[in-house]
Structure formats: structure tokens, C-alpha cells
């Protein structure tokens, strides 16, 4: 990139996202201003922008497609949702709830065959002359979009934009939620009438292709359905049950905090997965207990037995630390200790751990005190609101 050209004050101001627009949606006129940028680049030698998008994408006039899906916080039974681990533990179940931290996929149909990718949150851009050029690619700046498009194989050109409100490496399933949003948007764009379960299978399998290790199933259900879920992992399939708890009960008792440390969920899960499959008896026994804890926590939630939920959450965290010592960090240990002195009853990392987010269960009425203590000791408290609904299509 020619830095002198990039810093030129003569080029038009680049199109920006409006603070008043829904997150991830370009304001009206975005594509037109983008075209002006390319025209300037062609006339004034702005090679950096010519490389970014040349020729300028021209909307076809077909409707823009926008799909959104929420992230999640997991309570119990994680990692056991990896196939075939749950088949070795009778009655395996995993518990989680959707949080109103949203991912978005937006598809703008274009004239011609060119394909453009733009990630709003990671600032990554990529383009291809046509589908065949994308199919022959080996490495991608936006692998999620690229792999999904390879699967759906749309015939026409388009601009695919993604955005996620989740912090990087948070462990709240931002990537899986975005997989669901992208699956839904591309299915609609290619006129594929998929059920929610078909979307789950596609998203889970393509994500495994991207990260190169097995993926669990639990992350996709909050993105699809929202609410509080008990996901039963049986030999005849996976079955999602809505847990009938008022969302306000969850919101008043839990705090979600980001530790700022990125994590490698595939690596952490893969190490535990291998140990289980290799016959590590200690890991097997721990998973037996994790399955029992998840089942017991499901019943405790149904009874609104929050003391029981706290006890089980503490026990699950202890077992997870035994299975994978790298699941915690000094900051996580510090925040859990600080929370315990201010009304926190239990805590665990979200996802595979090694950093990212921690979910804290507090005494009734103590959530604000716990949140303040976490913020004063290096954690970043995220807004915690249960997403009442899962996947939805929004107007452009």
C-alpha cells in the first residue's frame, strides 16, 4: 500500500457507518460514496482503493438481506457437546442462555459476478472476480464468509458484510452466532428453504472445516432460538428444550465480564477431546461428573433453587480446571476471588477458557456491587440481557 497516496488529503472522505444506524448496517448512500472513492482512485492514482474494490460494486436493485443472531453464556455441560463424547455419558445435557450481544450478516446483491467481503468489526476486506476465483482460493482474509459462500455457491455477485458486538476471543460464541446469521442470509440469497436444524448442521460443519478440529453443537441453539436452553444430547439426535425461567431472574443474578485475554477455543477443547478419546480415565470420570452436574443444574433451575445452582456451578468450574489447567488465568482467578468478597456466589469461564469472558452468579441484589468490584480490578463488565429471540431477519 502506498502510504503517501493513502494519506492524501485530496481524496473524498470514505463512507462511514452512522452511529444512528443499527449496528452493522451502512447508512443510505454508502454504496454511492464507495463508488466515488473508486472513481477518485482511478483518476488520481489512489492504488490502495483500486486494490480494495475495483471495479466499484453496483447494487442490482434486488432486496438487501440482513440476518442477526445473538451470542450466548454457557452454564454447564460444555465440551461434552462434542460428538461423539456425549454418546459415552448417558443423559448428557448442556445448559446456556442467549445474550443480547448480536452478530449480523448483510448481503447486498450486485450487478455482475464479483464477490466482495467486508468485516465491520475486524476491518478486513476481500474480493473475488467470481465464484470460481473464490473456489480456487486457499487462504482467505475472511474465512467464515469464504467457506460459507463456497458451500452455498450463489450464481450472482454480491457484497457480504459481517459484524459482531462480541469482543475478540470472548468465549461467548460470537463466531458460531455469526455462522448462523451468515448461513441464514446466504440461504435466503440462494433461495434455499432451510429448517433451523438444517442451518445448525451446516453452520457447525463449516465451522469445523474452518478451525480444523471438532465443534460442539451447543453454541448454535441460542443463536437460533434465543432464551434459556437445555440441550439434550442423545443417541437419536440433539433435542433443545426451553427452560421456563423468567429472563429477568437471570438478568438480576448474573454478571458477565470480559478479561481481555484472547483464547484458543479449538486448541483447549481439542486437548481435552483427545484425552477423552485416548482413554484417560481421570478425564472420563470428570466428564461423567460434568454430565451429572448439568442434569442436576437443569432441575435446580426448574425449582428456582439458586443456592443449588451456585453450588453446582462451583463444582463444575473445579472439574474444568482439573481437566484443563490452562482454562484459567491469574486475572480470572483474581476476579473470581474479588467477586466472592462482594456477593458473588459462583463463577466459571465461558466457552473453552484460557481468557475471554467469565460469568458470575451473585446473591439476589448484589449484581451491581459485584460488577463494580470486577470493573475496579481489571475486568470489563458487559451488558447482560437475555436475548428473548434468536435468529431474525431485519429490514435493511
PLM features per residue range, with description:
Residues 166-170, 345-347:
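Short pre-catalytic strand/loop immediately N-terminal to key active-site residues, enriched for Gly-Thr
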Residues 6, 14-76, 80-83, 87-88, ...:
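C-terminal nucleotide
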Residues 161, 185, 382:
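General small-molecule cofactor/ligand-binding pocket signal
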Residues 172-192, 196:
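DPxDG-like acidic metal-binding loop motif
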Residues 355-357:
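Glycine-rich active-site/cofactor-binding loop and its immediate structural neighborhood
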Residues 126-133, 158-168:
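Glycine/charged-rich beta-loop-alpha catalytic/anionic-binding loops adjacent to active sites
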